[in-house]
Amino acid sequence: MPLLRIATRKSLLAMWQSEYVAARLRMLRPDLDVVLVPMSTRGDEILDRSLAAIGGKGLFLKELELAMLRGDADCAVHSLKDVPMDLEPPFMLAAVLSRDDPADALISNVYLSLESLPIGARVATSSLRRQAQLRFYRPDLRLFDLRGNVNTRLAKLDNGDYDAIVLACAGLRRLGLEQRMTARLAPPEWLPAPGQGAIAVESLTEDARIGTLLAGLDDLPTRQCVVAERTMNRALHGSCHVPVGAYASYEVGGMRLQGLVGCVADGRLVRAELCSAKDEGDMLGRAVAQCLLDAGAAELLAATA
């Protein structure tokens, strides 16, 4: 029986996502023996500093990529929003699965919406993109960094450390925690991270056998949307150091891409959106990035450089 080894982080969410991919592969190939290879990453272990301060979201990938290079794993499963915009050779995104809910969720045990939070409320999130949008809509809020897995973050909220926290809806749904969502923060008013809500499978470019196996998981509409989002971010030279949001969706007549660049310090947001009748995510992403730059995003990007 052919064997396929999936490298995965050890968190409950990462294990859920990897087991989901494994189950899909077993359905496609009943003759395939799919096993998980759990491991810790530096991004999981260093929790007392922001991601921007310790090297970015690529820290969630490095150990998994090394396992593939050593021959200890054949592929790795990630939340696509955690995958750097430019994967360095010899790695590629072999599959992007159908997207789940791309929105963020406000979670509070007392208050029912972002608008109902009291003046000066304590809201925690590690994402600069979320912080910038919070600052735009509620400049009075006190914002805090919050790292760790989903249950760790919820526990800090439940212990009274904060009045509210912001997490991704998709992660909560995958863990069966939908009931913790107080309010959805969703497009068009609130933009997610590029690729948010999608699961990605990474493999070695040169491994044609694995690439062919994983291609059966790929969802073309999702891939085309996230290509537009990630291209926009790449054209802006965005990273976890920069508050960038993007969301592409199919509508009657083609694809719409909405983008924003923000500033945590003063809550400024620069927005742009365009539609394309063609499935040209790269072109649409570059066009929206240029619109953002023309509208003043360059100043915000320079301020965070």
UniProtKB/Swiss-Prot annotation:
Where along the sequence do coiled-coil regions lie? none
Cystine connections: none
The cofactors it requires, by name, are: dipyrromethane
What InterPro entries does UniProt report for this protein, alphabetically?
A: HemC, Porphobilin_deaminase_cofac_BS, Porphobilin_deaminase_N, Porphobilinogen_deaminase_C, Porphobilinogen_deaminase_C_sf
- One Pfam annotation reads Porphobil_deam
Q: Could you list this entry's UniProt keywords, alphabetically sorted.
A: Porphyrin biosynthesis, Transferase
- The catalytic activity of this protein is classed by the Enzyme Commission as 2.5.1.61
Question: Gene Ontology terms, cellular component aspect?
Answer: cytoplasm
* Secreted among keywords: no
Where does this protein act, in terms of pathway?
Answer: Porphyrin-containing compound metabolism; protoporphyrin-IX biosynthesis; coproporphyrinogen-III from 5-aminolevulinate: step 2/4
Cofactor binding annotation: Binds 1 dipyrromethane group covalently.
One example GO MF annotation = hydroxymethylbilane synthase activity
Residues recorded as bearing S-(dipyrrolylmethanemethyl)cysteine in the entry: 240
| One BP term from GO | protoporphyrinogen IX biosynthetic process
Q: Superkingdom of the source?
A: Bacteria
The catalytic activity, as recorded, is:
4 porphobilinogen + H2O = hydroxymethylbilane + 4 NH4(+)
The miscellaneous comment for this protein is: The porphobilinogen subunits are added to the dipyrromethane group.
Quaternary arrangement and interactors, per the entry? Monomer.
Role played: Tetrapolymerization of the monopyrrole PBG into the hydroxymethylbilane pre-uroporphyrinogen in several discrete steps.
**Family recorded in the similarity comment:** Belongs to the HMBS family.
Q: Which HAMAP family match?
A: Porphobil_deam
Name this polypeptide is given: Porphobilinogen deaminase
Top-down, what is the taxonomic lineage of the species of origin?
Answer: Bacteria, Pseudomonadati, Pseudomonadota, Gammaproteobacteria, Lysobacterales
